[in-house]
């Protein structure tokens, strides 16, 4: 399941190379904001120490440990939307190669999304940490489903605030703050009203990287959200 990560893995040799690549990715992300690869690589290069902290939190949790051992992946092969949509409504996950649920499948189908669109981690030097960051990117859509937020600019920014508070990743922090300035006046006011609750949920809920989504077979979405203290 890590073949793509291994084949794509290109750790940078020294701090100078890391800084120069970081600078180039930042320029490209600014010049070509619709190209997700540049922003993704910027997140990798700026989030190394934060990813190490996330890895430690996973090691200190029994479920997180199992995720690190099993290294499950979110791919079109493991998350077949057409199969997910056959499950009972209001469920979230199913075991084996189906995983997830009607809610997640509907979310992906209605928006014409594919889990294969997530760029593969490239620059994080340690392969174990590269997996951790890849896992974060691959469960991002699950967070949308759990928080009940869509994929408009406003909704994406709200999710980024949650991720910033939960994970502390620089890329999430940058997206949360910079993205907020791009909202119109009405959306900014709505965000100000929403933020206290989102930050509260981020602080009280289970650490999202320690959730083994693939093991929630036919779990009712509301029950799952309750168990994760998201309600």
Swiss-Prot record:
Zn(2+) binds at residues 140-141, 144, 156. Keywords: Lyase, Membrane, Metal-binding, Mitochondrion, Mitochondrion inner membrane, Ubiquinone biosynthesis, Zinc. Pathway: Cofactor biosynthesis; ubiquinone biosynthesis. Its cofactor is Zn(2+). It catalyses: a 4-hydroxy-3-methoxy-5-(all-trans-polyprenyl)benzoate + H(+) = a 2-methoxy-6-(all-trans-polyprenyl)phenol + CO2. One of its GO terms (cellular component) is extrinsic component of mitochondrial inner membrane. It is found in: Mitochondrion inner membrane. Coiled coil: none annotated. It holds the Pfam family Coq4. Its EC number is 4.1.1.130. It is a peripheral membrane protein. One of its GO terms (biological process) is ubiquinone biosynthetic process. It is an enzyme of class 4 (lyase). InterPro entries: Coq4 (IPR007715), Coq4_euk (IPR027540). This protein may be expected to contain an N-terminal transit peptide but none has been predicted. Belongs to the COQ4 family. Component of a multi-subunit COQ enzyme complex. Lyase that catalyzes the C1-decarboxylation of 4-hydroxy-3-methoxy-5-(all-trans-polyprenyl)benzoic acid into 2-methoxy-6-(all-trans-polyprenyl)phenol during ubiquinone biosynthesis. This is Ubiquinone biosynthesis protein COQ4 homolog 1, mitochondrial.
């Amino acid at each position: 399941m890590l073949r793509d990560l291994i084949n794509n893995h290109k750790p940078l040799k020294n701090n100078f190379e890391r800084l120069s690549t970081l600078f180039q990715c930042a320029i490209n992300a600014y010049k070509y904001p619709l190209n997700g690869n540049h922003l993704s690589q910027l997140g990798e290069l700026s989030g190394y120490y934060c990813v190490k902290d996330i890895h430690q939190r996973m090691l200190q949790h029994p479920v997180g440990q199992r995720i690190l051992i099993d290294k499950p992946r979110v791919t079109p092969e493991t998350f077949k939307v057409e199969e997910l949509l056959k499950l009972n409504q209001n469920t979230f996950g199913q075991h084996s190669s189906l995983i997830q649920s009607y809610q997640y499948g509907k979310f992906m189908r209605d928006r014409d999304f594919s889990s294969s669109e997530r760029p593969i981690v490239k620059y994080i030097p340690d392969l174990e940490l590269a997996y951790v960051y890849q896992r974060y990117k691959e469960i991002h859509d699950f967070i949308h489903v759990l928080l009940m937020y869509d994929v408009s600019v406003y909704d994406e920014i709200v999710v980024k605030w949650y991720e910033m508070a939960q994970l502390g990743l620089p890329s999430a922090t940058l997206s949360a703050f910079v993205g907020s300035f791009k909202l119109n006046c009405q959306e900014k006011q709505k965000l100000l009203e929403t933020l206290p609750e989102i930050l509260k949920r981020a602080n009280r809920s289970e650490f999202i990287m320690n959730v083994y989504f693939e093991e929630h077979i036919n779990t009712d979405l509301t029950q799952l959200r309750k168990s994760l203290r998201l309600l």
